[in-house]
Amino acid sequence: MVLRGRAVLLAVLLAAGSLGRWAQKPRGAPSAISAIQPKANFDAQQFAGTWLLAAVGSACHFLQEQGHRAEATALHVAPQGAAMAVSTFRKLDGICWQVSQRYGATGVPGRFLLPARGPRGAVHVVAAETDYHSFAVLYLERARQLSVKLYVRSLPVSDSVLGAFEQRVAQANLTQDQVLFFPTYGFCEAADQFHILDEVRR
């Protein structure tokens, strides 16, 4: 039961696009992610492979309070037609976990819908900027709360890529104090069969 509880916790953390509670916006506020354009002619085949999470910009209070507990996080991406199969690898209590999810197609290349647990609904995902071989900036929105994520193929992050990310963060009305940089070491490459959570089949 303890193992199962940890698995559920990890799924909730990943589905939220960050690590926890969000500051609430008025219900009447427009959806910020609807105005964000995906990369022109987004190519899921070129986007496939491994991405390392370098930084997250978010207004999540829990993220700011518990940022010192952030773990190195890697994404393994495989195209499934217009959709993408995404496996996230990160540690929880020192153990490597794999969470398998499906970024569902929406009819717009580069714009995806990720089913998620809980009453706050699905996560909207936009691959807004990428050169495919070095970096990618993804926006995630759930219950009208937006986060900006920077992924890279390898570390360290170049100054030009960091500058592009910081510009995106500013455009999302987030400050530098709301940016969390993730560890650059300790990445998980695999998880054993007892630490795999398949959200696709649920």
Curated annotation (Swiss-Prot):
One of its GO terms (biological process) is complement activation, classical pathway. Residues 1-23 form the signal peptide. InterPro entries: A1-microglobln, C8G, Calycin, Lipocalin_CS, Lipocln_cytosolic_FA-bd_dom. It holds the Pfam family Lipocalin. This is Complement component C8 gamma chain. Heterotrimer of 3 chains: alpha (C8A), beta (C8B) and gamma (C8G); the alpha and gamma chains are disulfide bonded. Component of the membrane attack complex (MAC), composed of complement C5b, C6, C7, C8A, C8B, C8G and multiple copies of the pore-forming subunit C9. Disulfide bonds join 96-188. Component of the membrane attack complex (MAC), a multiprotein complex activated by the complement cascade, which inserts into a target cell membrane and forms a pore, leading to target cell membrane rupture and cell lysis. The MAC is initiated by proteolytic cleavage of C5 into complement C5b in response to the classical, alternative, lectin and GZMK complement pathways. The complement pathways consist in a cascade of proteins that leads to phagocytosis and breakdown of pathogens and signaling that strengthens the adaptive immune system. GO terms for cellular component: blood microparticle; extracellular exosome; membrane attack complex. Gene3D superfamilies: 2.40.128.20. The gene is C8G. Membrane attack complex (MAC) assembly is inhibited by CD59, thereby protecting self-cells from damage during complement activation. MAC assembly is also inhibited by clusterin (CLU) chaperones that inhibit polymerization of C9. Its main location: secreted. Keywords: Complement alternate pathway, Complement pathway, Cytolysis, Disulfide bond, Glycoprotein, Immunity, Innate immunity, Membrane, Membrane attack complex, Retinol-binding, Secreted, Signal, Target cell membrane, Target membrane. It comes from Oryctolagus cuniculus (Rabbit). It comes from the Eukaryota. It is found in: Secreted; Target cell membrane. Belongs to the calycin superfamily. Lipocalin family. One of its GO terms (molecular function) is complement binding. Glycans are attached at residue 173.
